[in-house]
Amino acid sequence: MKDSIVVTDGLTKRYGEHIAVDDVRMRVAAGEIYGFLGPNGAGKTTTLRMLVGLIRPSAGTATVAGHAPGAPAVVRRIGVLIEGPGFYPYLSGRDNLRVLAKYRGLGRDDLEDALDRVGLADRADDKFRTYSLGMKQRLGVGAALLGRPDLLILDEPTNGLDPQGMAEMRELITALAGDGHTVLLSSHMLSEVQEICDRVGVISHGKLLAESTVAELRGASSLLLRAEPMEVAFPAVRGVVGERAAILTASGIRIEGVDGTAPAVARAVIDAGADLLELRRDERSLEEVFFEMTSGQ
């Protein structure tokens, strides 16, 4: 894995007796899109707020770009959108970013580059209050892009958007990663994370349950076989792949984690005298994996 730009070790946040974030150990590699996945109230936003120095951890440590959260060296290298964008409704999109750029000592080129990259250059002089929700979210990302930071931390950037707005935001995030930004993206939208993220951390009730690539999290693909009669086909399949790999389900025979066995399985079923109705690769969705992991939480 590439060098880590975000590292936490035992990161914990307590509010009285309530533990909002519990011993989280995460790694975000430079250049990747990292999906921080969990249901509402899982501890995602609290974790992000600790990473940017907005709140102090109760225990544990975090480093961002090699420094403690909130350090001046970190502030210059990260762009943040947490809990929705906040702008002056009576100012234009351009003027809102101009206020932020001036505060940070940035010039006109930075401002115009940010507007262009989020696709708002042609609407930049419209008042913020006239923007659609999707445009407001994109302006928020534009604000995070001021100064071309190495790391973007985006908290639920598609929350509340319609399907078109969600698609546009996914395209934008993918393009930003292609331009060399690392993106730490929190979301409860499983399909969104599966589609654009390189690696995923799954959090539930404050605990980080898993951290891996999307492919690793979903696991090896399986085969699904339907045949008649099943009482003939099932023993034939087990004879090829073994008892543990073949599972009889309501939808057919699921063959887990045995690559390259499809031809042999098909022959065995037919030779046993059963009619082979269907044999296809069946991959678990991230949604299925997520619910399996969090159902006991």
Model-derived features: where do they sit?
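Short low-complexity, flexible loop/linker segments enriched in glycine and/or proline
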Residues: 201, 292-295
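Conserved beta-strand-loop-alpha-helix hinge in the C-terminal portion
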Residues: 207-228
